[in-house]
């Protein structure tokens, strides 16, 4: 592997935690250079339609994935329906943000501006959001 461990805090990760943890693990395996994106941060992901949440604690050598939210400790909190969260990972990026020159990027940008995808902490932590997007990106 890449020297970065993806660990699950809970014995039985919820579906969102398993999906996101697996995605990060696969991306780090396929693209070892993405290890450089890891900086200390806490990120909550909330799928409102499935009533499920996960928190990621990022570190240079480990990504800890937990069920639920980080109780106010998160630098970023992304809240959307589960389809929009998946679309976020599948959107072409430019500088770590959805590329508005691609139709998929414009669609995700519209959802962010229309608050279908809510990103709390984006203005305070834009680089964290950019690194997270590139870490999760499957494109």
Predicted segments with their positions:
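Feature captures hydrophobic
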Residues: 1-139
């Amino acid at each position: 592997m890449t020297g970065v461990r993806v660990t699950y805090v809970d014995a039985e990760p919820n579906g969102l935690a398993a999906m996101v943890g697996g995605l990060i693990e696969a991306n780090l395996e396929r693209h070892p250079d993405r290890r450089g994106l890891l900086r200390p941060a806490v990120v909550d992901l909330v799928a409102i339609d499935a009533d499920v949440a996960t928190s990621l604690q990022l570190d240079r050598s480990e990504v800890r994935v937990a069920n639920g939210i980080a109780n106010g400790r998160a630098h970023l909190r992304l809240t959307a329906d589960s389809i929009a969260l998946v679309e976020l990972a599948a959107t072409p990026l430019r500088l770590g943000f959805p590329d508005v020159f691609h139709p998929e990027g414009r669609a995700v940008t519209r959802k962010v501006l229309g608050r279908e995808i809510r990103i709390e902490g984006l203005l305070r932590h834009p680089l964290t959001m950019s690194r997270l997007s590139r870490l999760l990106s499957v494109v």
